[in-house]
Curated annotation (Swiss-Prot):
Taxonomic source organism: Arabidopsis thaliana
Highest taxon above the source species: Eukaryota
Protein family according to the UniProt entry: Belongs to the trans-sulfuration enzymes family.
Record has Chloroplast as a keyword: yes
CDD domains, A to Z: CGS_like (cd00614)
Protein name per UniProt: Cystathionine beta-lyase, chloroplastic
Main function: Catalyzes the penultimate step in the de novo biosynthesis of methionine. Its role in methionine metabolism may affect plant development in different organs, probably by modifying plant auxin transport. Its cysteine desulfhydrase activity may be involved in hydrogen sulfur production using L-cysteine as a substrate.
Amino acid sequence: MTSSLSLHSSFVPSFADLSDRGLISKNSPTSVSISKVPTWEKKQISNRNSFKLNCVMEKSVDGQTHSTVNNTTDSLNTMNIKEEASVSTLLVNLDNKFDPFDAMSTPLYQTATFKQPSAIENGPYDYTRSGNPTRDALESLLAKLDKADRAFCFTSGMAALSAVTHLIKNGEEIVAGDDVYGGSDRLLSQVVPRSGVVVKRVNTTKLDEVAAAIGPQTKLVWLESPTNPRQQISDIRKISEMAHAQGALVLVDNSIMSPVLSRPLELGADIVMHSATKFIAGHSDVMAGVLAVKGEKLAKEVYFLQNSEGSGLAPFDCWLCLRGIKTMALRIEKQQENARKIAMYLSSHPRVKKVYYAGLPDHPGHHLHFSQAKGAGSVFSFITGSVALSKHLVETTKYFSIAVSFGSVKSLISMPCFMSHASIPAEVREARGLTEDLVRISAGIEDVDDLISDLDIAFKTFPL
């Protein structure tokens, strides 16, 4: 990296003119050039050309200044450098190799097609369905965050999950968790079987059930941890070992956690899905999905499906995600802290029967969760034992918007059995322990005291 500062007569008055007017010393420099050329190594800065100060001056640098420069160089030479920046730093320091002008905001390449160099030669891009610089910038960043070989952005989380199911052929099997997002459940129970794929549903928190379900025909194991909405925790490491022993891939829907809190690929998963609509974009203004994958062979298969099916994310939607993702770590930190305090308040409330949140010490999966994630996130649920009370809470609060989805800066509240999970038959929901009085909360970035007070008023206004 080289930066320079030069004074040219075409831009400023000559030094002679300034000197004649008494505005500058006769011994002032006629040219100033500063060149900074750091050579980075794994853990420290090399002392060779690590800091070069080049001044062309009539007056030589005095001994004190020379000593200061040497001391600065020595300090830089011995400074320990982290092997990798933290997520919050990576998010705002995107290496945008797609922009020749180094704009601070990644450019939006709002185009459907690209001019080619000749009739028989192709440029780096030809048609946005197949690739676009704005999408590539987002995918490159997401791959880095998830420690993936490649990442791919889709028009929604469900489009991303649908692409994964197309990796499985007629007669092969998918083993999937029984407590998953309602849209995923609909895809697995009503759409995937049409192609001749066998779907087995198990409680992924019970390793013996998972082991019994995985067989020679199993090609994919699909799980969420924590699950949506009941916050059940599965052992991603051990399930990955079981699946790989049979030659199956492992998919983890990591939408509730995001790359800030969990990296399932490092735990053994092969594919990680994010609904980028949620924490990645963070503002409820765009739909998007992500698949982050390990291995070039798998990456090529996923790209083939994305390109062939036309499910790649549009440039403007990619740009919105790039804008939102810069504050993801900051948002999640605040949202998670709010969720923890609200969950603690609810867990001690006499009208609440149970709170499902892995961040609470008495959660049965608490220790397992924190062995594979950095935090519990900001989505949780609770039951009251009364559908009427739950309905009153959802409808009476003024700072929680009644809406599906989660991960927005705005706090959201819902009753999953009537909203996000309504497509699951009632008898199936009941068998899985998904009761109609269940309330799901996605904590936003508001003042937590206002949110707790809002809930408290709602409880107090419900007739006994």
